[in-house]
């Protein structure tokens, strides 16, 4: 009983911290910064998107750095593709209605200008150490760009960055999504429990899956930024292209449902109770909060993670790297999140879950299981808790 109470207390604390961090003040701050930077850069995400996509695949010949611009981009994308645009989109749609997808795309549009600025500053204020390693990111451009009197803010950012990296979106969210997917595939009824901790049962599928992921991550991370970039350059394009192809199969396979899905998304973005019904409890405020918040979570625009990787890019051109960094938001949210959202809405996967049992990875899995023409080969029978 004490263990269950402790687990509930931990969940309550995490929930309160989450609501505080992803509340309106932070969302408005990051979104307002994106709007301001969009105006200041003259809508760089519109005027130079084509050039940015070209620079993304064409590395600079005589740049200074440790990894290619494409490698730095893939390193940043490896932290966002799979978590925010698969799990996050599904959760946003279930909690905020299909209209959350539209607000997510709006956040991504302005977030592209923020990402451009982050990449620009990463190169402008990076430092080359004696061992030829390049270091940069928010800690450096806060201190060097704003002045030494703001060094305390750079240190504070580093402390919070470590906390988020260890206990937030850096590790826990990813491994939870992977573990849930592995368990639902190999042991959907949780019949083989390895141990119980804080009131939660952990199956052997979860334990073994976690150990495999830990080993793979260790082998990559211990090789430094160069090995991380090399592995990311192979894995990220492969998983992104594969995911896009399968998502397109689902969406195009339900092509007749697309107009109704788009209409539902637009209607529920501005009048969710009229589109979904008053009983759902979804309001325009909730749709905006979940959509914009999950959008920022998905592409990490303004969170300061991408410029750390961008600082190691082989380039002398600040504008060029800013444009390359900007494409991360375009790929992550504008392309992949849109396809994820459409695949969920056209298949109606979000309707199989109630707010109290929302688990994003299961919702997206259901869309794939029921939406793919060969779903019989991929489908695993859901447990009763999956269909509540």
Language-model-detected regions and their locations in the chain:
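N-terminal alpha-helical transmembrane segments of multi-pass membrane transport
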Residues: 2-83, 93-100, 111
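Membrane-interfacial loop-to-helix junctions in multi-pass transporters
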Residues: 22-27, 59-68, 98-99, 147-155, ...
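Membrane-interface loop-to-helix entry segments
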Residues: 29-36, 40-53, 175-182, 204-266
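Extracellular/periplasmic helix-exit of transmembrane alpha-helices
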Residues: 38, 118-126, 130, 246-264, ...
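Flexible loop linkers connecting adjacent transmembrane helices
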Residues: 43-69, 91-93, 97-101, 113-148, ...
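Alpha-helical membrane segments and immediately flanking helix-loop junctions
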Residues: 63-95, 121-145, 156-159, 163, ...
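Selective recognition of specific alpha-helical transmembrane segments in multi-pass small-molecule
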Residues: 110-118, 210-225, 236-256, 289, ...
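Single conserved hydrophobic/aromatic residue that forms the stacking wall/gate
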Residues: 379-388
């Amino acid at each position: 009983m004490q263990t269950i109470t402790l687990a509930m207390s931990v969940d309550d604390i995490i929930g309160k911290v989450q609501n505080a961090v992803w509340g309106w003040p932070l969302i408005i701050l990051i979104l307002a910064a994106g709007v301001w930077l969009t105006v200041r850069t003259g809508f760089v995400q519109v005027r130079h998107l084509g050039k940015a996509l070209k620079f993304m695949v064409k590395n600079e010949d005589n740049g200074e750095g440790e990894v290619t611009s494409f490698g730095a981009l893939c390193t940043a994308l490896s932290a966002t593709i799979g978590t925010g645009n698969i799990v996050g989109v599904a959760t946003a749609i279930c909690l905020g209605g299909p209209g959350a997808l539209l607000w997510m795309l709006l956040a991504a549009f302005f977030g592209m200008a923020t990402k451009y600025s982050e990449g620009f500053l990463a190169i402008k204020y990076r430092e080359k150490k004696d061992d030829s390693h390049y270091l940069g990111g928010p800690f450096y451009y806060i201190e060097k760009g704003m002045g030494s009197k703001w060094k305390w803010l750079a240190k504070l950012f580093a402390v919070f960055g470590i906390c988020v990296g260890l206990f937030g979106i850096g590790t826990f969210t990813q491994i939870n999504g992977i573990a849930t997917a592995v368990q639902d595939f190999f042991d959907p009824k949780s019949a083989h429990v390895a141990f119980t901790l804080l009131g939660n049962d952990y199956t052997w599928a979860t334990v073994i899956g976690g150990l495999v992921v830990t080993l793979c991550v260790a082998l990559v991370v211990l090789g430094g930024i160069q090995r991380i970039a090399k592995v990311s350059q192979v894995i990220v394009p492969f998983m992104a292209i594969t995911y896009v192809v399968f998502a397109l199969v689902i969406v195009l396979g339900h092509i007749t449902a697309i107009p109704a899905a788009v209409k539902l998304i637009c209607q529920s973005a501005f009048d969710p109770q009229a589109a979904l019904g008053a009983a759902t409890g979804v309001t325009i405020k909730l749709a905006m909060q979940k959509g914009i918040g999950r959008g920022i979570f998905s592409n990490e625009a303004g969170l300061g993670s991408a410029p750390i990787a961008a600082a190691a890019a082989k380039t002398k051109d600040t504008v060029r790297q800013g444009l390359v960094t900007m494409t991360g938001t375009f790929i992550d949210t504008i392309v992949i999140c849109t396809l994820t959202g459409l695949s969920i809405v056209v298949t109606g996967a979000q309707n199989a879950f109630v707010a109290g049992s929302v688990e994003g990875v299961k919702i997206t899995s259901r869309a794939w299981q029921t939406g793919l023409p060969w779903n019989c080969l991929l489908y695993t029978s859901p447990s009763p808790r999956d269909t509540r």
